[in-house]
C-alpha cells in the first residue's frame, strides 16, 4: 500500500561548525527509538559521524542520512534526516543536500549566534527555497541568550524570526521552555535523559514576558493571514491554537516567517518539541510545487506530480563507495515508484541501468527495502555510470531536472606515489574519490608531470589524503599547498591559424580564422559561436575545433594556469579534401589559442577569501595590522557579545598558516573563519613573481 505522503518529511539539519548539529541528530535517533543509547560527538561515538576522520576530529565531513519514525497527534510520520557539515571546506555536502530536501532545521549556538557559515548555509537554503525553522541550541552554556540570537537572525540574515518558545532559565539553570502557541510550560526530566517531560505552570516571573511575546507571535501571524487581523485587533486571545498553527504553517511554507525554538541537545532538553514542530510546520513532498523538467527528445517542459501514478523520476545527489556493497548512489524520488530489480534511464548518459538493490540508510549502515516510494530518499546499487546531479527516470517518459552547480576548487597539493606498487592504487583511489566529491579536481601538470589534487581548503585535502591512506592503502608524498590561480582574458583579438604537416603520404591540414575574447556574461567555461557559412569548413569538423579550444583552456599562456572563461567566434577557414581531418582541426584550435591569447590581454587571477575574526578588543590593533600586511581589504568592524568582529577580504596566498599566527598574536583568544569569496586580478609586481616561480626563473629587479 502506498504511504500517505502527507506524513513524510525530508529535512536537513544545518548550521555553523560546533553549533551541535550531530548531537541534536543523535538525540532525535534516541528519542525516536532508533538508537537505544546516546552517541556523543566528544567521545567519538556519534552514529551519524561514522568516518574515522570525523570521530577523531569531532566534526562532520559527509552528509549522513537516516530515517526515523515519529508519532505526533496520533499520526505516524516517516522522517528522512540529513545531518550536514558546518565546516566551510565541506559546503558541497550542504549544497547537494539542500537541493533534495523539503525543510530545514537551522541550528544556532545560544552563545555565538549567527556565524559566518550560518550565513553561507542560509543563503544556500534561500537559493533552493527550503522552508525552515530555527533551533537555538546550547541554552545551558554560559552567555546563552535566546532573544539576542533571534534578533541576530532577523537583522543579519534578513528573515522574519518569530519566537514560538521562551527559555525557562538559562546557562546552568536552563530547565525547559514556555510554548507561546499553546501557553504552556514544559520541563524535562533529567533522570531518564529527557525521554519524558512534564507540563508545569508558567513561572510567575515569566508571565509578563510570556504575554508580551505571545502578542508578538499573534501579530506576526495576523500580519500574514488577513483573516486573523480583525480578530487580533478586537481580542487577540480569540485566535485559537488551530488558527495560529494553520496560519504559521502557511507562512513557513511561503518563507515569510522563521519560527524560533530553543533547547539544549547535550542536556537532553527541547528536542522532542522541536520534532513536533517539524511535523506541524515543515512541508511534506505534497506541499512543494510540481516538478518541472525538460524532455530531452522534444526540448519541451514536462511536469511531474508527487504521486506514485506519475512516471518515475529521481535525482542522484550523492555517490559514495561502501566497502561491502560497492558504489552507492543516494537518490531523491520525486514521482512514481522505484522497485528493486527494475530498470531506470539516465538522461545524461543515455543508458538504461538495472537497480539491483535499494537501501534505506542509517549513517553508514543499510537496511534493504523492496521499493523506494515517491517523495522518499534512499540509496541504490547497480549503476555502472552515474554522477552527482544525474536525472533518473522512466525510459518511455524522459525528463531532465535542473542539475547542481558546485564551486570551483581554490587550493591544490602536488602528490606522488611513494613506491611503484602505489602507482595503480593511487589512480583507483583518485578516480573513486573524484566520483564521490564534485569539488575535488585532479589534473597532471604538463611541465612537471606531477599529479595536482585540488579542493576547497587545507582541511578538505587533508581528509582526502588521509582517506587515500586508510581506505585505499596508498602511501603518498605530498607537496606544500598551492593556490589555484587562474588566467583571464581582458580584450578581443582576431587570429588565423594554419596547421600544416607533410611527412610523406597523407598530410595534415586545417585553416581557421576566429575571434578570441572575454565572455560578456559571468558564466564559466567556453562560449563557442560558429559563424561558418557555405561549408568552407565541413560541419563534422566543428565539434573538434570546439574540443580543441576547451582542451587549450586547461593551460593558459602566462604560467599554464587554466583560463576560467572565454568566448570564441569561428568566422572563416578552409580545408583540404585529402589532408584535413578532425584531429587536424582540433590541433589547429589548440595552437591557435596559444598564439591568439598572447594578444588578448591575459592576466593572472587569485582566489580571495572572506575572513571574519572574532577577537577581544585589546587585540584589535595587532589583528587588523596583520591583515593589512597580508594585502587584506578591510570591510568593516562590529561589536558582538563583548568582542570585536573584524571582516576583511584577503588573498588565499597570504593565509597559509594564518590560524596559527592569529593564536600567537592574540594569545590564543581570537578565532577566525575563512570562506571563499571571489577571484581578483593579481597586482602586476606579484604576477611577475608567480610566473617566475612557476617557470623556475629569477625575478628581474
Curated annotation (Swiss-Prot):
Cited CDD domains: EF-G (cd01886), EFG_III (cd16262), EFG_mtEFG1_IV (cd01434), EFG_mtEFG_C (cd03713), EFG_mtEFG_II (cd04088)
Domain tr-type G: 6-286
Protein localization: Cytoplasm
Keywords recorded for this protein, A-Z: Cytoplasm, Elongation factor, GTP-binding, Nucleotide-binding, Protein biosynthesis
Main location: cytoplasm
Annotated GTP binding sites: 15-22, 83-87, 137-140
A GO cellular component entry from the record: cytoplasm
GO molecular function: GTP binding; GTPase activity; translation elongation factor activity
TM region(s), chain numbering: none
Pfam family membership, one: EFG_C
GO BP term, example: ribosome disassembly
Function comment: Catalyzes the GTP-dependent ribosomal translocation step during translation elongation. During this step, the ribosome changes from the pre-translocational (PRE) to the post-translocational (POST) state as the newly formed A-site-bound peptidyl-tRNA and P-site-bound deacylated tRNA move to the P and E sites, respectively. Catalyzes the coordinated movement of the two tRNA molecules, the mRNA and conformational changes in the ribosome.
UniProt family annotation: Belongs to the TRAFAC class translation factor GTPase superfamily. Classic translation factor GTPase family. EF-G/EF-2 subfamily.
UniProt-recorded name of the protein: Elongation factor G
Natural source organism: Cytophaga hutchinsonii (strain ATCC 33406 / DSM 1761 / CIP 103989 / NBRC 15051 / NCIMB 9469 / D465)
Lineage of origin: Bacteria, Pseudomonadati, Bacteroidota, Cytophagia, Cytophagales
